Amino acid sequence: MRSSYAGQVSEKLMGQTVTLMGWAHRRRDHGGVIFIDLRDREGLVQIVCDPDRAEMFKTAEGVRNEFCLKIVGLVRARPSGTENANLVSGKVEVLCHELEVLNPSVTPPFQIDDENLSETTRLTHRVLDLRRPQMQKNLMLRYRVSMEVRKFLDANGFIDIETPMLTKSTPEGARDYLVPSRVNDGHFFALPQSPQLFKQLLMVAGFDRYYQITKCFRDEDLRADRQPEFTQIDIETSFLSEEEIRGMFEGMIRTVFRNTIGVDLPGYPVMTYADAMHKYGSDKPDLRVKLQFTELTDVMRDVDFKVFSAPAQSKNGRVVALRVPGGADMSRGEIDGYTEFVKIYGAKGLAWIKVNDVAKGREGMQSPIVKNLHDAAIAEIIARTGVCNGDLIFFGADKAKVVNDAIGALRVKVGHSDFGKKNGLFEDKWAPLWVVDFPMFEHDDEGDRWNAVHHPFTAPKDGHEDYMDTDPGKCIAKAYDMVLNGWELGGGSVRIHKAEVQSKVFSALKIGKEDAQVKFGFLLDALQYGAPPHGGLAFGLDRIVTMMTRAESIRDVIAFPKTQRAQCLLTGAPSLVDEKQLRELHIRLRNAGAAGNA
């Protein structure tokens, strides 16, 4: 039996005989003495193999990297000057008495401590990749986060209840993963995008406080912070106001950060969606970046520069400035690089002005666009931006969405750049906030219809119900997102608990009564049986752990993730299935060669 983890051997065990089991991380032969770094999930310890134990030493000579070993030995102090302050075991070593190879290893395709591996190599050989100390730390932290969440919720009266994985396809924004039913010909289950409706039904059923740490599935285009299957901390509660819900779960996240990584998060400012978009062009602003938009739409309506005046005069247009203190030192090449960057977000280009001497007005400015702006516009730019000598001003002018996306991304990129950090435009800190008062609906110009911004079960703010009949664009939702360092950690809303209001929302979304009954009849029926006021939210566990570890991707905090093409390189999923399986499911492929042989 193992008596201790390798990574936990310390001075406390000095003079004791220990039994350790793990993997040979590294083997070194120094003048007839063999050193083996034994690794397990808790860390490393140095094993010393002396030749005076002939049989053990002979076994040690044959040990290679990644052999699985059992070690019995004496814990002793390392010789002076050989201590390793980076290890828990850094002041001690284990003098080996017995060495058993539990299982040898073929030569690994890479060194476990190699930090320059491609992601393809790492995901193809994920089992070996997971042996790397950083990956083990990431997944151990993930476990501790889950444990702290459960402890907090259990202490606050929440009940862990499972909801179905095979459910009904409902419109929630992304494409569903569909599962054909063998016994119900032509019918399909959907894997849940979230337990949204079931957790609301649990509130109607009277469970009062529910939570679940569960898998959710969305068949959508993938980015660095997305996976087709992801883990959600799902929560719902009855009889609490929006403010009480936010307060409780701000407390939960504070507790989790404090108890897992020793971080005391600062206070959470509350910002409306409208303010966030106005100042930062984003509903999840990174408040570590000290740059804000300056609104210039009204100023540019009468300038003789159509690049600015056309969007300024358009109902859906916007013109903003982004002042970059000290930015006049940027080279033309750097500015051209930012110009190409904003094109990724749909911008046609990037106008700019370098301010050399603000007191001279246009004469103190350097830019190809200055000649197109009248004196009043120049004066207003100077006054509103508060620009100083040596500053640079970027401009965004286009449809409001393009401006928000492009200049919002530019703001973050400049702030995070070496220039931004050198010039104090970025503060390395934890910057949480709540974003509230989201629009309830957004207009789809192509389809000429309104869509729900969050989901169609979000309650409108008091007094906004009538807007659903007259002007859905004015309707504000009781919705809230928790944002940390520019990432949405979680979000939720107060739900609709009255059937007539829910029907009104369906009507605004052009979901007819019959269609609503087919898709959501079970919910509408349940709401008629004294449904309590309720609300909740969901946190992305993958994102929380990614933030804590500062990993580049959520794939670094998931044991067996998918690629950006939704593939598992380890197992080869998704894969072809044989024709017999398809026949049992009453499925025939258009490309008959795509199925395997029966």
From Swiss-Prot:
| Subcellular location per the Swiss-Prot or TrEMBL entry | Cytoplasm
Class of this enzyme: ligase
- Please provide the record's keywords in A-Z order: Aminoacyl-tRNA synthetase, ATP-binding, Cytoplasm, Ligase, Nucleotide-binding, Protein biosynthesis
Q: Please write the reaction equations for the catalytic activity of this protein.
A: tRNA(Asx) + L-aspartate + ATP = L-aspartyl-tRNA(Asx) + AMP + diphosphate
Q: Which organism is it from?
A: Leptothrix cholodnii (strain ATCC 51168 / LMG 8142 / SP-6) (Leptothrix discophora (strain SP-6))
Q: What is this protein called?
A: Aspartate--tRNA(Asp/Asn) ligase
What is the primary gene name for this protein? aspS
Q: Which GO terms describe its biological process?
A: aspartyl-tRNA aminoacylation
UniProt GO MF annotations? aspartate-tRNA ligase activity; aspartate-tRNA(Asn) ligase activity; ATP binding; nucleic acid binding
Which residues bind L-aspartate per the record? E172, R218, H454, R495
